[in-house]
């Protein structure tokens, strides 16, 4: 399993999404990081329905764990994360659950936007305290489209 996961991460980083997905798909013991990485592969090839389904499944696996709204990071890192943070990178194994959940929500917001699930995007933004610049841009795009 570790070799498949490592291979999947390497392939994901090299943008070889079909091969990365194949590696993650062969892992029988799916934890939230495996499901997230499969979802990211789906997002990158514009298979948004499957991406959203996998993210919801991954989120279910996280439920009941100690998920905090904000990772305990120094202020400088939080400012950077809020301004520059994006979900388009693999999720490593062993990542603290609070960071994994934040990363999952960021990708889920992007996916929900592409599926026109605008209330979901707004709900995720509220859950994250409206602090993430790229999610707020998505919401502004929703608002701009509503005004057309």
Regions found by a protein language model. Give the residues of each.
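Boundary/linker segments of alpha-helical solenoid repeat arrays
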Residues: 32-37, 61-74, 130-143
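Alpha-helical segment of the N-proximal tetratricopeptide repeat
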Residues: 1-26, 107, 123
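Flexible helix-coil transition and linker loops at the boundaries of alpha-helical arrays
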Residues: 24, 63-98
């Amino acid at each position: 399993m570790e070799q498949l996961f490592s291979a999947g991460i390497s392939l994901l980083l090299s943008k070889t999404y079909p091969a990365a997905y194949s590696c993650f798909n062969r892992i029988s013991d799916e934890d939230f990081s495996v499901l997230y990485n499969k979802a990211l592969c789906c997002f990158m090839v514009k298979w948004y329905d499957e991406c959203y389904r996998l993210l919801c499944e991954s989120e279910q696996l996280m439920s009941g764990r100690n998920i905090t709204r904000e990772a305990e990071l120094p202020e400088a890192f939080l400012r950077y994360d809020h301004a520059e943070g994006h979900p388009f990178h693999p999720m490593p194994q062993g990542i603290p659950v609070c960071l994994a959940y934040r990363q999952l929500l960021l990708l889920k917001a992007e996916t929900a936007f592409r599926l026109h699930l605008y209330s979901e995007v707004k709900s995720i933004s509220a859950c994250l305290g409206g602090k993430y610049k790229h999610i707020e841009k998505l919401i502004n795009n929703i608002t701009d489209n509503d005004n057309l």
